[in-house]
Amino acid sequence: GAQTVLAELLQGEIFAFFLVFARLGSALMLLPGFGEIFVSTRIRLVFAFAMTVVVTPLVSEGLPTLPAEPISLAVLILGEIIIGVFLGTLSRLLLSMLQTAGTLIAHTTNLAAAQIFDPAQGTQGSLPGNFLTLMAILLIFVTNLHHVMLAALVGSYESFPAGVMPPLGDLAQLATRIVADGFFLALQIATPMIAVALMF
């Protein structure tokens, strides 16, 4: 009857919500500016929840239907978490290149021994590295780049459709290339300071 149809519709809506939340929540735990250790986990979860409420209607047409078997449901959720973690980790790698550049600068300017607490990583870091990282996080919000990151998460449903297990080999290859390019970029950022240190 009508109650059965309503119950099935409600189940489908709840399933769609949690499927989107799995991807967005796991990505927001790692995104620069959102995933920093000084940002409360509760705040991140509330923001992920609010964003899921907005995004779910936008992507609901491309979401799979609620599977009958629990194992299929678990695989779907796991796939979304993998995609979210991958997207968050990639953006985190791009930010970590600044910390690497700062460390290179510190070692060539005799600042390596001057360690300071890095609030972004929750560990000790070099002075130049901390400065570059915190400046990058500040610029992300000042220039509204966080809007671009959030839009990219929504756009990820075109590149990585929900319900389709991502090709792990391709993801690993992409991550490896970004790490290599990131280290090269960090070296380029540090090169002027290294050159000055070698001259004096």
Identify what each model region corresponds to.
Residues 1-200:
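Hydrophobic alpha-helical segments and their helix-loop boundaries in membrane
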